[in-house]
Amino acid sequence: MVETTGISDQTKKVLIGVAAAATVAGVGYLVYKSFGGSDLERDLEEIKALGNLKFKEKQYDSALEAFTKGVEKAGPNSSDQIVAMLYQNRAACREKVGHSPFDILNDCMAALKVDKKYTKAYLRAAKALNDVGKKQDALAYLLAAFTLDSSLNKTNFEFFGKLLAIEPMSDCHIGKPLKIEDVKPQPVALFRIQQWCDTWDILDLFKTDLTRFEPEVLSEDQKQYQLALEKFKKGKYEELIDLLTEENSYPPAMILRGKMLSYSTDPNEATRYIDKVGAKINELIGSEEDEERKKLMRDAFDILKIELMYTMADLDKFLESVPKDDKERLFKLYSFASIFVVIRLNHFYSLKIWFQYNGCVLDTAVTNHEQQMMADTNNANRLLTEAEKNGTLTPHLSMIVTFLKLCTSEDYADVHRRIREMEELAESRSTHFNLVLMSKVYMMTNNEESSKKLLEEAARITTRYLVPSRHLQTADLHVHKPEAERLRLTTESANAAIAVDPFNFSAHVLHLLGTNGPEPMIKKENYERAMESIRNAALFAPPRELLMLKRMIPLMNAKKRAAEMLDMY
């Protein structure tokens, strides 16, 4: 649509749908003439008014001719804003008559050279850039338009989402956090430790040993293992890898070393280690005389194997290889596998809530995951069904089953029934896991007061690997607050989680939202912090979450460029 108001301040936000203003073009012209001005200005205004009239009458060739006459009459050195309108209006005509996107783009650029805060020119340039295959540039120009006029967000959301899915993602290199090599001891992924420990209402080798590990005679390898257990109790998880040496040949120590390597900055090291010592672990487990301890070690090793798998196909193949008559083993493995999937799903629901209330500029990152969320839900349900065939579900597993049914229910009465079932489970066993999950359900149903009470109760449990998830859940309490307050409190929640777990994926994504918010451009200080948040989040991000972070790189770069073009960086 062409620009029609001759005397308006072009630095003001221009709304899509400005066509209605065309009806008052004549009035605008008379007002302009009453102000006086140079002969050239009056001539250009007359030409623009004629072009607008022809455009309104759908005589696009005639309108294009008029705007071209105005551009030529203005000359190359004109800085009058009416010249920017002539270029932008000619670009609109070029669209209508089917001219090359390069010609459209050239007119938009000429308009922006005169008026660098011309909203319509940025929007039309973005579409032309997309048409010539320059999606990254198009994203920057679109965000500049969003910055000048936030009302464009909704009307151009589909276009924005298309630009955000920039390929190939191989060009989006994240890199390591700054000075990560200087961090001693090297960090481990606390959310992975939580994922493992959330199955501890099922008998576990390490839960058993943490409660009591007192062999009559301790070998040096067992002493090393005992010391590792003590450090685990104190929350010093990062120290375990250096403590449990590669030479240790005590099976529980070897399995624990493999687990901690899988939670490290280089999880492939765990695969290499298990490839090297796996046969020896199996041999040592087989020679264990205590049958109960043999089963515990075997199950612990099986769970480690699951943790090292990357695809559901690998997981299903492994589970199918377990003898069908070994129900106890099948129950434990299917139970852990379901938790393995559910924790990932839990991250998605949190991210969805945070993105939903922090503006559309990051929403698309979540919608890309919708199908995977449903796939994870289906896989978790399937694994839990198999677990239930082989044993009685524990309180945690029962809570998860009900939660999954709640998330997929479309019946109002059934939703309330599932919530009540979860409330009863949480009341009967007030573990940190149950309290935080129940608080999430309350937030999903807008029961902020009940959610807050449960989180306060959960705060009494201070086990280190549990604390970050509670802080992250606390962020959900602020989603309905005014934007400035919401962003401040969101940042506080993220910082609290990061203080305990410096490289928590979800916390850094939350921090990214809190420091940058929904703004379509970004200032220098926030840009540098945002990029470091992405690097920190990527350190332990699972493969799919890593893809989401990679998609944030072109977005942040486009935000930066938008700010630079508008002199706001």
UniProtKB/Swiss-Prot annotation:
One of its GO terms (molecular function) is mitochondrion targeting sequence binding. GO terms for cellular component: mitochondrial outer membrane; mitochondrion. Expressed in body wall muscle cells, the pharynx and structures in the tail. It is found in: Mitochondrion outer membrane. TPR repeats lie at residues 44-77, 119-152, 221-254, 510-544. The keyword Transmembrane applies. Signal peptide: none annotated. It is a single-pass membrane protein. SUPFAM superfamilies: TPR-like. The chain crosses the membrane at residues 13-32. Keywords: Membrane, Mitochondrion, Mitochondrion outer membrane, Repeat, TPR repeat, Transmembrane, Transmembrane helix. Residues 33-569 are cytoplasmic. One of its GO terms (biological process) is positive regulation of interferon-beta production. Residues 1-12 are mitochondrial intermembrane. Receptor that accelerates the import of all mitochondrial precursor proteins. Belongs to the Tom70 family. Forms part of the preprotein translocase complex of the outer mitochondrial membrane (TOM complex). This is Mitochondrial import receptor subunit tomm-70. It comes from Caenorhabditis elegans. The gene is tomm-70.
